[in-house]
């Protein structure tokens, strides 16, 4: 079976949406929700605001209740019948995220074996045929075929095949099986 590795944040989990809601509700800002659809947080927020947001992300519980991306559960379930599915997610930047991320994955994707969940820093260690990720830096370091999942921070990137929804992922990977 071919190996398909999925990133968690902003691929399976709608982390960006949670961060935007925190900024709009808890920060002093003139920005609106539409601003965050066109540019990444690093482009829009002051460094002090980013630092504050990172502290919030490193709080136990932050990653526990993030919404699942629409269509992700159903599509990944179907894909698991044809591909060996792995999840590779970073947790070293936010060390308190490990338990929350693992519990989140077990809750929403119980059909992915715990042995196929990889917590890492640099995704160059991943040996897989495909990697779907929202960060180009992870795709650059990957030896297989990288596929960019659309997010506001990568809208200008053109070097990789792109998917924007889980329906796109389904069309790309399930039409050939």
Where in the sequence are the language-model features?
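Short, acidic loop-to-helix structural element flanking the phosphoryl-transfer center
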Residues: 55-87, 94-99
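Active-site neighborhood of HAD-like aspartate-dependent phosphohydrolases
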Residues: 1-51
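Structural alpha-helical scaffold elements that stabilize or flank donor/cofactor-binding regions
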Residues: 4, 79, 124-125
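A structural signal for isolated positions on well-ordered beta-strands in alpha/beta enzyme cores
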Residues: 84-86, 130, 147
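Substrate-recognition "cap/lid" segment bordering the active-site pocket of phosphatases
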Residues: 88-141
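Short amphipathic alpha-helix with an adjacent loop that forms part of the alpha/beta core around
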Residues: 168-177
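Acidic, Mg2+-coordinating phosphoryl-transfer loop and its flanking beta/alpha structural elements
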Residues: 132-167
């Amino acid at each position: 079976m071919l190996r398909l590795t999925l990133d968690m944040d902003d691929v399976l989990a709608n982390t960006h949406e949670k961060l935007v809601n925190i900024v709009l509700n808890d920060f002093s800002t003139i920005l609106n929700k539409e601003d965050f659809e066109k540019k990444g947080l690093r482009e829009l927020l002051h460094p002090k605001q980013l630092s504050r947001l990172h502290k919030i992300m490193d709080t136990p519980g932050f990653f526990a209740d993030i919404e699942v991306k629409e269509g992700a559960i159903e599509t990944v379930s179907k894909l698991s019948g044809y591909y060996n599915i792995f999840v590779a997610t970073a947790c070293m930047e936010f060390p308190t995220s490990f338990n929350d991320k693992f519990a989140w994955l077990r809750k929403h994707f119980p059909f992915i074996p715990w042995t196929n969940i990889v917590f890492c820093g640099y995704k160059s260690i991943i040996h897989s045929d495909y990697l779907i990720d929202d960060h180009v830096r992870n795709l650059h370091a990957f030896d297989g075929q990288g596929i960019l999942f659309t997010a506001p921070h990568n809208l200008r990137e053109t070097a990789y095949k792109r998917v924007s929804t889980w329906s796109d992922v389904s069309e790309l990977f399930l039409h050939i099986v």
